[in-house]
């Protein structure tokens, strides 16, 4: 039978509950346990797929095509597992399921209420992850902050689960902030005390308190928190600000978090094997080089909108012994007159995915600059589509070439809506989503990176290269180095003769790991390193 760990947050949002949960997952896995992990999100959207990146940050896509919270990306990267759509549950999804059951008559004419119907549905989602994964431990993060009205059904459900499963099978971890008041030159424990009091008023007594803070807690403060929050002193865990999120698992291991969790769950394991993780962190702390990548997008004011891209770049940097400096370039500000000023110092240029026509011409201008100057270029999803548009306009000479997403009346619709998308009216969950195979052409950059013929990558798009123009594009030198195995859809394009110019219709960033960078990101940063060396040699 699986054991369950629930992670809640208090005082303020964005404390790092997701990093805490992911780090615990890594520590448990290092002890030989099979770990499953999920997030319960209190917003009423069914999923974040239609939410603005400014509201939510990036949408992380799973292997099975779920559009999920960005914390699931942390889970995959830290624990090195692929998780499924069942691992992200929202209030909207819960209510939709309950209402559908009511319409089908599954409640026998009863009055449908938050308790028991909504809470039972939540409990079923938590337990189903354990059943499907056959995990030893299931970690569940509850989004939001204790006291939020939206979180109440989730907190009630996890309260009930302790009674359903037995006390020895459930652990509650509460992540809080211990703020530092500069004027008083001291840390304050009162917000944590009040947060725990609020949580206990809902029937949940935390077993472990993880204290986020800028400065170390004194022994007296730990004892005070243990006394007022009614936990053992050893269960007051310090989580200091870290230079890198990848140091957090090692910091929490030193604090004894995993050992306390296992003791409370009655699980005995061998010692942790964190040698690879320690080696990676040590390598990360001793990077010898600096590589500058210009990321040209329209959501750059909120860098979480490109979280997986930024992490994948850093992973590749670790591999090459290089720190990565990301220049966040607003594509709306890029034009032919300022590309040198904005992009001239970059060792590589990356255009990520996105939607809508705002900032499109700036991205195309950035791609032109990379192509003409021989700067390594990497395009992702929309970045590939715009690379095709730029090539069509400026190499072939098709004036007005565009995607029908931005110009339905373009004379050269080199990017067009996928045929299966034409009859769809709903926006949510209707794109080409999830993992699909891609067949690579030997001798290309893509094949040299992957070193195999068939790869699987994750997608999130409605538009694709228009096959009516493939022959003309190829005749002018564009190489289609990756396609669906049947050859129907183009997945990767390249420009031979350029030091490194490659773009993908898929999102390789979602499969990168800190100790195993994605092959394309690895080779992109390698090319950027060579470009930088050639400039200064």
UniProtKB/Swiss-Prot annotation:
The keyword GTP-binding does not apply. Mg(2+) binds at residues 71, 141. One of its GO terms (biological process) is 'de novo' CTP biosynthetic process. Residues 292-534 form the Glutamine amidotransferase type-1 domain. CTP binds at residues 13, 148-150, 188-193, 224. Keywords: ATP-binding, Glutamine amidotransferase, Ligase, Magnesium, Metal-binding, Nucleotide-binding, Pyrimidine biosynthesis. It holds the Pfam family GATase. Allosterically activated by GTP, when glutamine is the substrate; GTP has no effect on the reaction when ammonia is the substrate. The allosteric effector GTP functions by stabilizing the protein conformation that binds the tetrahedral intermediate(s) formed during glutamine hydrolysis. Inhibited by the product CTP, via allosteric rather than competitive inhibition. UTP binds at residues 13, 188-193, 224. Residues 1-267 are annotated as: Amidoligase domain. One of its GO terms (molecular function) is ATP binding. It catalyses: UTP + L-glutamine + ATP + H2O = CTP + L-glutamate + ADP + phosphate + 2 H(+); L-glutamine + H2O = L-glutamate + NH4(+); UTP + NH4(+) + ATP = CTP + ADP + phosphate + 2 H(+). Its EC number is 6.3.4.2. Pathway: Pyrimidine metabolism; CTP biosynthesis via de novo pathway; CTP from UDP: step 2/2. L-glutamine binds at residues 54, 354, 382-385, 405, 462. ATP binds at residues 14-19, 71. It is an enzyme of class 6 (ligase). InterPro entries: Class_I_gatase-like, CTP_synthase, CTP_synthase_N, GATASE, GATase1_CTP_Synthase, P-loop_NTPase. CTPSs have evolved a hybrid strategy for distinguishing between UTP and CTP. The overlapping regions of the product feedback inhibitory and substrate sites recognize a common feature in both compounds, the triphosphate moiety. To differentiate isosteric substrate and product pyrimidine rings, an additional pocket far from the expected kinase/ligase catalytic site, specifically recognizes the cytosine and ribose portions of the product inhibitor. Belongs to the CTP synthase family. Homotetramer. Catalyzes the ATP-dependent amination of UTP to CTP with either L-glutamine or ammonia as the source of nitrogen. Regulates intracellular CTP levels through interactions with the four ribonucleotide triphosphates. This is CTP synthase.
């Amino acid at each position: 039978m699986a054991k369950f760990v629930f992670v809640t947050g208090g005082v303020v949002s964005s404390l790092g509950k997701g990093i805490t949960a992911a780090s615990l997952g890594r520590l448990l896995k290092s002890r030989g346990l099979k770990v499953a992990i999920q997030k319960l999100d209190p917003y009423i959207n069914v999923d974040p797929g239609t939410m603005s990146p400014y509201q939510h940050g990036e949408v992380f896509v799973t292997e099975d095509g779920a559009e999920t919270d960005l914390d699931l990306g942390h889970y995959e990267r830290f624990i090195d597992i692929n998780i499924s759509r069942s691992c992200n549950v929202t209030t909207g999804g819960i209510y939709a399921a309950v209402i559908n059951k009511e319409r089908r008559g599954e409640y026998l004419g009863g009055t449908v209420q938050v308790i028991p119907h909504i809470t039972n549905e939540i409990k079923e989602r938590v337990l189903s992850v354990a059943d499907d994964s056959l995990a030893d431990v299931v970690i569940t993060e509850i989004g939001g902050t204790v006291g939020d009205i939206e979180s109440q059904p989730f907190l009630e459900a996890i309260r009930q689960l302790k009674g359903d499963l037995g006390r020895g099978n459930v652990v509650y971890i509460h992540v809080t902030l211990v703020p530092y008041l500069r004027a008083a030159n001291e840390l304050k424990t009162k917000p944590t005390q009040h947060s725990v009091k609020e949580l206990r008023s809902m029937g949940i007594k935390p077993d472990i308190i993880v204290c986020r803070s800028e400065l170390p807690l004194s022994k007296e403060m730990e004892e005070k928190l243990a006394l007022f929050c009614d936990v053992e002193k050893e269960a007051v865990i310090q989580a200091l600000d870290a230079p890198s999120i990848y140091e957090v698992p090692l910091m929490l291991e030193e604090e004894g978090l995993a050992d306390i969790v296992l003791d409370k769950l009655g699980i005995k394991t061998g010692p942790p094997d964190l040698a690879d993780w320690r080696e990676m962190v040590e390598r990360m702390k001793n990077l010898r080089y600096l590589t500058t990548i210009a990321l040209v997008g329209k959501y750059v004011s909120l860098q979480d909108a490109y979280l997986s891209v930024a992490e994948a770049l850093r992973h590749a940097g670790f591999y090459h012994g290089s720190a990565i400096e990301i220049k966040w370039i607003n594509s709306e500000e890029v034009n032919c007159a300022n590309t040198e000023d904005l992009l001239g110092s970059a060792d590589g240029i990356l255009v990520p995915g996105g939607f809508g026509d705002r900032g499109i011409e700036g991205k195309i201008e950035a791609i032109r600059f990379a192509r003409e100057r021989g700067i390594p270029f990497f395009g992702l999803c929309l970045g590939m589509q715009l690379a095709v548009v730029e090539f069509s306009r400026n190499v072939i000479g098709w004036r007005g070439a565009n995607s029908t997403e931005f110009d339905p009346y373009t004379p050269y619709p080199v990017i067009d809506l996928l045929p299966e998308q034409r009859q769809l009216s709903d926006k949510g969950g209707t794109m080409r989503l999830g993992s699909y195979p891609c067949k690579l052409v030997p001798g290309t950059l893509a094949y040299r990176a992957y070193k195999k013929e068939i790869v699987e990558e994750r997608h999130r798009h409605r538009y694709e290269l228009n096959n009516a123009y493939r022959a003309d594009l190829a005749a002018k030198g564009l190489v289609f180095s990756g396609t669906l195995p049947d050859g129907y859809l183009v997945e990767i394009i390249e420009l031979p003769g350029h030091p490194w110019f490659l773009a993908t219709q898929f999102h390789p960033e979602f499969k990168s790991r800190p100790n195993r960078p994605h092959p394309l990101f690895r080779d992109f940063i390698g090319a950027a390193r060579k470009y930088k060396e050639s400039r200064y040699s």
